[in-house]
């Protein structure tokens, strides 16, 4: 690595500050915006309109994702499909993992966890903070019919005092998964600069 440090910093001595700077720059370079979704968005500039490069099922899934019926886009809000806050998504009726609340000791943060990016979700299993789901179908079914009520459940998953049920049909669940797969950036996943330096 001495040669690389010399190229990057004009000095071959590796210090913790230089390693920190190099890692920070590397992480900032990891941008994933060349997916099928991004291609469609570039042509329409509106994620709610049908994309000509999508199948009917992918467009239906996209419509569901951004619809009030599912509210997916209420938590996965940014271009990276990530949330700005931690949320309690009803994994457990009785909280055994207090999440953020276990760290900051605030009751209203019990059971809350960071909302992850959905970019490249096709290759990021297992899912949820504890890895309890191994497939996207399980995740979709959780939000469709498996959300557990607890006193700290995010309001987006409530309908009055009850848990919201999405009541998605089998074809809607398939469509939602098909849409999520359009967020996979194959160029990013195969980019040599992100490959293991030890191979």
Give the ranges of each region predicted by the language model:
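C-terminal capping alpha-helices of c-type cytochrome domains
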Residues: 2-7, 11-35, 122, 132-199
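Short glycine/threonine-rich turn/loop motifs
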Residues: 35-155, 191-199
């Amino acid at each position: 690595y001495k040669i690389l440090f010399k190229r990057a910093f004009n000095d071959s001595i590796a210090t913790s500050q230089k390693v920190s700077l190099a890692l920070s720059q590397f992480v900032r370079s990891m941008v994933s915006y060349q997916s099928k979704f991004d291609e469609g968005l570039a042509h329409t500039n509106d994620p709610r309109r049908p994309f000509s490069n999508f199948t009917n099922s992918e467009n239906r899934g996209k419509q569901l994702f951004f619809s009030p019926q599912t509210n997916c886009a209420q938590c996965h809000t940014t271009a990276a499909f990530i949330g700005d806050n931690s949320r309690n998504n009803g994994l457990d009726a009785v909280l055994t993992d207090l999440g953020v609340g276990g760290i900051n000791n605030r009751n209203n943060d019990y059971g809350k966890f960071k909302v992850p990016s959905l970019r490249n979700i096709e290759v990021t299993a297992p899912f949820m903070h504890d890895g309890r789901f191994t497939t996207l179908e399980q995740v979709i079914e959780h939000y469709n019919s498996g959300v557990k009520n607890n006193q700290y459940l995010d309001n987006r998953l409530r309908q009055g005092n009850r848990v919201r049920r999405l009541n998605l049909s089998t074809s809607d669940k398939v469509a939602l998964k098909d849409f999520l797969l359009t967020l996979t950036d194959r160029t990013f996943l195969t980019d040599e600069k992100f490959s293991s330096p030890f191979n």
